[in-house]
Design a protein with these regions (language model features):
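Short hydrophobic targeting helices and cationic amphipathic motifs
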Residues: 4-6
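Non-catalytic interfacial helical region
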Residues: 16-24, 32-168
């Protein structure tokens, strides 16, 4: 068995090869700790594999923009990444930043991108493919900042790690 142990102050995470969570939410206002934890999770999942083929990163704020506003990413790109097999490798990690922006829109909001993003992420969380791992990150400091149904599903089958300098 291979073990990776992260130790920083009072926080310890132990990950074994048999216990690689498909879904990870890493959040908090301690950006360095969030980034170090995410980097170590990615390194563990993609050990010996080329990152350029096996790692994709999306930003929720970019995904929520209309097509004319953003030439970078759109929700269809995320859906395609989710639905296609990894290329030239046996596994893929998809990182989605600003996870606090993924919320179910109110019925009269009229924001189609918000609805599409929520449905796509809900689909990912409810049925992650065998050869893919998903890491969600956020600078939010409270669990209430996230969509309740999404965070509940991550709690049931994934890893949630919070790094904050203070408690409210």
């Amino acid at each position: 068995k291979v073990y990776l142990i992260l130790i920083h102050r009072k926080n310890t995470i132990m990950i074994s090869e048999n216990n690689l969570h498909k879904l990870c939410l890493i959040y908090g206002n301690q950006k360095l700790l969030v980034d170090e934890t995410v980097d170590s999770i990615i390194k563990e999942r993609l050990e010996g594999r080329p990152y350029e083929w096996a790692l994709e990163r999306f930003y929720s704020d970019e995904l929520l923009k209309n097509k004319g506003e953003s030439g970078k990413q759109n929700i269809e790109d995320l859906l395609i990444s989710y639905e296609t097999l990894p290329m030239l490798t046996d596994r893929k990690v998809i990182r989605i930043d600003n996870f606090e922006l993924v919320k179910k829109p109110s019925k009269n909001s009229g924001n189609n991108n918000q609805h599409l993003l929520y449905e796509t992420v809900e689909k990912i969380i409810n049925n992650p493919p065998d050869n893919m791992w998903f890491i969600f990150t956020s600078a939010a400091t409270r669990e209430q900042d996230f969509s309740k149904p999404l965070i509940q599903n991550i709690k049931e089958s994934g890893l949630i790690k919070k790094f904050t300098a203070y408690e409210n």
